[in-house]
């Protein structure tokens, strides 16, 4: 049995939000259905035009049942947690926070569209793109894996990291799902070699060194404190980690630290900027630090305090994987 959270599709499109390079724990598990992990739970998400539909599995549920849960046949039991709240209301609130549903997205789309003709044309086919509020630890190490990589391979590496060092949560449809490992689990002396053997290459060293550095600074609490700093201060601290340059630091600031003005500039965004906004940058072979700053400042001036959100919509619109898979195109074919 599906639980429902009212949310129109124009406010959240799962395909773009879950599969657009923000988080690497989600996979398509059925028609209009995605399975992934956050908050020490396995989530199965779907949607109709008016609602997010969801099912949740936790390790405690499986231990209580002592068998595999048949999700499609068996409704979730309504239980209470230590605060006296029922799990259903807690999980509904977790979804609201994860998808930042407090932000009225349609209003911002209208505002950005009125300011920018290129955004307006992209937004027609790419409605409902949201910035996820991710766990900073997972976000940091996921994007260390992103260096010179594609979404499919990053996803594979992140899942390998979880299966090697994370705690089992639950088995769903024959697949075991794991929580993301805590920072301290990645500081062991054997971590780098083990990750190299698992195909992480030079990223293995970055993961181990960054884990050790984060623990020296105070662990996950230190990362959480970066939310209270200014965007520039938080980015400056992140760049001190191994394997974290300007783009990765901006991804972390945007996707897990709440600095929504952050603009990660990769080849996609460079091409979008040069083609549509900053023509004097066309034809450059590499994005210099000066160009990186210029592109970021241009979008911040154009879009304001949620510039990183608007930029993410343009990023999704430029991804080849979405060119033939937009809900708008599917409706037209039907």
Would you name each region that the model predicts?
Residues 1-334:
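HhH-family (HhH-GPD) DNA N-glycosylase catalytic core used in base-excision repair
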């Amino acid at each position: 049995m599906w639980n429902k959270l009212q949310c129109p599709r124009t406010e959240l499109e799962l395909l773009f939000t879950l599969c657009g390079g923000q988080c690497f724990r989600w996979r398509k598990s059925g028609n209009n259905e995605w399975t992934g992990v956050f908050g020490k739970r396995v989530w199965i998400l779907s949607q109709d035009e008016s609602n997010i539909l969801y099912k949740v599995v936790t390790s405690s549920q499986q231990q209580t049942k002592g068998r595999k849960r048949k999700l499609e046949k068996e409704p979730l039991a309504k239980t209470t947690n230590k605060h006296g709240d029922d799990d259903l209301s807690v999980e509904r609130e977790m979804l609201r926070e994860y998808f930042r549903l407090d932000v009225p997205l349609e209003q911002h789309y209208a505002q950005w569209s009125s300011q920018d003709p290129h955004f307006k044309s992209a937004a027609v086919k790419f409605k409902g793109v949201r910035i996820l509020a991710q766990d900073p630890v997972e976000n940091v190490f996921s994007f260390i894996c992103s260096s010179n990589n594609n979404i499919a391979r990053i996803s594979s590496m992140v899942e390998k990291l979880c299966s090697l060092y994370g705690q089992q949560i639950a088995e769903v449809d024959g697949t075991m799902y794991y929580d993301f490992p805590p920072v301290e689990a990645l500081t062991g002396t054997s971590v780098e070699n083990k990750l190299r053997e698992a195909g992480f290459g030079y990223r293995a060293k970055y993961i181990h060194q960054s884990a050790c550095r984060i623990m020296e600074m105070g662990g996950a609490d230190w990362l959480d404190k970066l939310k209270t700093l200014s965007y520039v201060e938080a980015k400056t601290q992140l760049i001190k980690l191994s394997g974290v340059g300007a783009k990765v630091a901006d991804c972390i600031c945007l996707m897990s630290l709440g600095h929504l003005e952050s603009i990660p500039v990769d080849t996609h965004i460079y091409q979008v900027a040069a083609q549509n906004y900053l023509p004097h940058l066309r034809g450059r072979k590499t994005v210099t630090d000066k160009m990186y700053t210029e592109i970021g400042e241009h979008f911040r001036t154009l879009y304001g305090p949620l510039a990183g959100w608007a930029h993410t919509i343009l990023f999704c619109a430029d991804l080849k994987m979405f060119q033939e898979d937009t809900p708008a195109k599917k409706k037209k074919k039907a």
